[in-house]
């Protein structure tokens, strides 16, 4: 919420492809003329920005905050998920002190908070304990929307492997791709989404804009849409 307001099935890995973090698959497609095969999805693992995101707070400060919220386990779980307090999240869930899909006043779950903050270990723990990857906020945001808005590619990749809907639309008809397209630092997330054969880049928001329209206006990476065009949902010539 604070950050956002500034502006279960097992994963199907059989049909997935992994790739190095050091090269651009979309540009490889362009230079080699390859097509994305049916069922392909990226397992990009990315780099975590958790250390950079964390404020300069010492352990004593965090423990003091937790003590203040101890009588409200749901509030504590939401806070701990956002602040990357993995041990606290694990304790609350193991003690069943708080429900894994508890919500705040705007219907954000702990998974939403961990997703927009980029805390992959907390995300893994929450999903393992039954967190709903399809949960929506009052504005219709899923955890995948939250991850893609803030270019948390590692989290987005994990959520997609756990059945998150890549084409889910908010109440404003925004897809995760729309949100990534509006972020000037979103190259990694754009690559992840555009490499997924199930992506529907033609979907429009309530302003009748596609993600490509937004990227051309706001991002230096609009060319990624041009590279991906004709590759996704295609079959090699016979």
Curated annotation (Swiss-Prot):
Keywords: ANK repeat, Differentiation, Nucleus, Phosphoprotein, Repeat, Spermatogenesis
Region described as Disordered: spans on this chain: 38-57
Keyword Nucleotide-binding: no
Keyword Acetylation in record: no
Cellular compartment(s): Nucleus
UniProt xrefs under InterPro entries: Ankyrin_rpt, Ankyrin_rpt-contain_sf
Superkingdom classification of source: Eukaryota
Tissue: Expressed in spermatogonia, spermatocytes and round spermatids.
ANK repeat coordinates: 72-105, 106-135, 139-168, 172-205
Biological process, per Gene Ontology: cell differentiation; positive regulation of DNA-templated transcription; spermatogenesis
Phosphoserine PTM positions: 48
Biased composition (Acidic residues): 48-57
Gene Ontology CC terms: nucleus
SUPFAM superfamilies given in the database record: Ankyrin repeat (SSF48403)
Annotated function: May have a role in spermatogenesis where it promotes autophagy in response to serum starvation, via the NF-kappaB pathway.
Name under which the protein is recorded: Ankyrin repeat domain-containing protein 49
């Amino acid at each position: 919420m604070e950050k956002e307001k500034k502006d279960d099935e097992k994963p199907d890995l059989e049909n997935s492809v992994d790739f190095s973090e050091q090269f651009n698959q979309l540009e490889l497609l362009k230079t080699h003329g390859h097509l994305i095969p049916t069922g392909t999805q990226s397992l990009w693992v990315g780099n975590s920005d958790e250390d950079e995101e964390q404020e300069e707070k010492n352990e004593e400060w965090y423990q003091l905050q937790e003590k203040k919220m101890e009588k409200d386990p749901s509030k504590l779980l939401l806070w701990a998920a956002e602040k990357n307090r993995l041990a606290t999240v694990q304790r609350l869930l193991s003690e069943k002190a708080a429900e894994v899909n508890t919500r705040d006043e705007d219907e954000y779950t702990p998974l939403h908070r961990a997703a927009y903050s980029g805390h992959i270990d907390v995300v893994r723990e929450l999903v393992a304990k039954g967190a709903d990857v399809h949960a929506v906020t009052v504005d219709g945001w899923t955890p995948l929307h939250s991850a893609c808005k803030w270019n948390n590619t590692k989290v987005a990749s994990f959520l997609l492997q756990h059945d998150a809907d890549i084409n889910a639309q908010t109440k404003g008809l925004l897809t995760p791709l729309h949100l990534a397209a509006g972020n000037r630092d979103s190259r990694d997330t754009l690559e992840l989404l555009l490499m997924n054969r199930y992506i529907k880049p033609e979907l429009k928001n309530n302003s009748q804009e596609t993600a490509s329209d937004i990227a051309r206006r706001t991002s230096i990476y609009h060319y990624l849409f041009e590279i991906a065009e004709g590759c996704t949902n295609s079959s090699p010539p016979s």
